[in-house]
């Protein structure tokens, strides 16, 4: 029993180390070869705030080149040295889109997701697209942590806010997705895959109307690997992709949730490349989405997103962002995106 317990713990630690190494490879974050101490960074930031106006360039040169752990240590040192909250000082010194982007970046990943969700579920700033994107693109372990952080930050359960601010089948899929345990492994039960593909066909394209309950059950209970296998089986049996079936059988925010879950099961980087392109297409730029995606994915898989963007749109993501933004706001986002290669 004891040996089994420690073996399991060792395997868990090894998986975490592998994920950490993978994140480092996929991240676009660049930093100095020998990072200054958090204390030195705190001193330099304090200097940047002094005098007439804020030295935005100095702030970007530090903040945009430190990882989540380093940023947390800088905030701790700043508070200790100057008896002042760095987050609040940044909010008072920066303005406009640069302020929004930097403050979003200063959070740790789970705290950032919780903040995005809380703002998206607020009666004053409701943004169900951002809520759907964040919830339906995160892994079960990320959602588990996120729910705990959400409650500790805002004193209310995430499920309660979803219940209050969403409607119908959109509400049902979000609640099911954040409360149902799912495997993060790659094991697939082929018999169950075939049964699920048949059930989805029977619930959608085969009948007049749609049995939304079946879509909600399967999309919320099955792992990403299992959903990818269902899609392949569905295509083989019925000559149509599951994505097309979802588009023809559902609509609105419910459709958005199902498509986000399915596309992130296949290829999260490709999904986010599409989201970024849409944010920069048409009249004006959707800066809220641009900031949210770049800031939340920089330390996770932005290298992959950049590659998918280049592949699909024949233009680098850096060039696209450069043409749609300006000033220090542009400099900050491009710093997060790393070299244009």
Label each PLM-derived region with a short phrase.
Residues 22-341:
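Structural signature for extended repeat/solenoid scaffolds and their inter-repeat hinge/linker regions
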